[in-house]
A protein has these predicted regions:
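Solvent-exposed alpha-helices and their adjacent loops that cap or buttress functional pockets
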Residues: 77, 98, 127, 158, ...
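N- or domain-start disorder-to-order transition segments that initiate the globular core
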Residues: 160-189
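Amphipathic alpha-helical segments in well-structured domains
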Residues: 28, 180, 209-213
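Phosphodiester-processing cores and adjacent nucleic acid-binding clamps
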Residues: 99-102, 128-130, 149-152, 162, ...
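A phosphate-binding glycine/aspartate-rich beta-alpha loop in the early core of alpha/beta enzymes
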Residues: 13, 192, 200-267
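Intrinsically disordered, low-complexity, mixed-charge
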Residues: 1-165
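Short acidic, glycine/serine/threonine-rich loops at helix termini
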Residues: 60-61, 97-98, 115-121, 168, ...
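Structural motif
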Residues: 104, 113-115, 163-165, 191-194, ...
Length: 271
């Protein structure tokens, strides 16, 4: 729209993208320049191949077309899962927002990709989200080209998306208003909780009580091997670990990797 071009874009069966555009040469050149230099923050372009085509079809607009299962590449590039973005985090905490406190909040800048994809091309019908048809509210965002959830394949809300629930270790459901807050309370009291994430289960316990940690080590057969520690923020991390700018950059990146750090002098977590 910015460069006044017409045509279409569509996903391909190898996770590539096909773009067909018509317009003035200068506008097409500007588009290709923007494609390389002003791509979305999460986009990674491995290769751009262009070719001139005879204009066999007239286009009235630029649209997103139905995906194709055709492949052009020798392999596939599957997008990774991405940690929650700052905008979704703000919405998550805003009581006036429709997705307030919704654990599965996502947009085009964050959320699951790799672990929800069942096959390519990357469309909702080819992911685990096919079991959750969008409500009218989510569909309007999905169709709005000015919205950051425009064609976000995992878009969902409390009305149409997955629901969180809490069970006893025997599988019986615990009937509570907020399963996530209830699970947090159990953790604080010393319980071990199995959290089902995008790609499997995480066994977690509090880091400040010795008994649950000893029990978790016995359960996992990890007498000495370190566990990964989740922390609320860099400010909290400063209270028990040392890190520099590079570590801080990694910890707050969209990858959110596990980073090995030195204990601080005032380290207080259980061993």
């Amino acid at each position: 729209m910015k460069n006044k071009l017409k045509g279409y874009v569509r996903n391909m069966g190898d996770a590539g993208v096909e773009i067909v555009i018509t317009g003035k040469k200068g506008d097409i050149d500007n588009f290709l320049k923007d494609l390389r230099e002003n791509k979305p923050s999460l986009a990674k372009i491995h290769r751009v191949t262009t070719s001139a085509m005879k204009e066999t079809e007239k286009y009235d607009d630029f649209t997103i077309s139905v995906s194709s299962r055709k492949t052009e590449l020798s392999g596939s590039v599957i997008p990774p899962d991405v940690a929650i973005c700052d905008q979704c985090l703000l919405e998550l905490k805003a009581e006036s927002n429709p997705r307030y406190d919704y654990f599965f909040i996502t947009c085009t800048d964050c959320g699951p990709r790799f672990t929800t994809i069942e096959r390519l091309p990357y469309d909702r019908k080819n992911t685990t989200m096919k079991a959750f048809p969008m409500c009218d509210f989510c569909r309007e965002e999905y169709k709005d080209s000015s919205d950051r959830r425009f064609h976000a394949q995992t878009v969902a809300c409390t009305n149409c998306g997955p629901e969180a629930y809490l069970t006893e270790n025997n599988g019986s459901v615990i009937d509570v208003k907020s399963p996530i807050r209830e699970a947090a309370a159990h953790l604080s009291e010393g319980s071990i909780v199995a959290i089902k994430g995008y790609g499997g289960f995480h066994l977690v316990c509090t880091t400040t009580k010795e008994k649950p940690l000893i029990r978790l080590r016995a359960t996992k057969h990890r007498k000495q091997k370190p566990f990964a520690v989740m922390t609320h923020s860099l400010e909290v991390l400063k209270t028990f670990a040392e890190f520099g700018d590079r570590e801080a950059e990694l910890l707050t990146s969209y990858i959110r990797p596990i980073v090995v750090l030195r204990k601080s002098e005032n380290y207080f977590l259980s061993e």
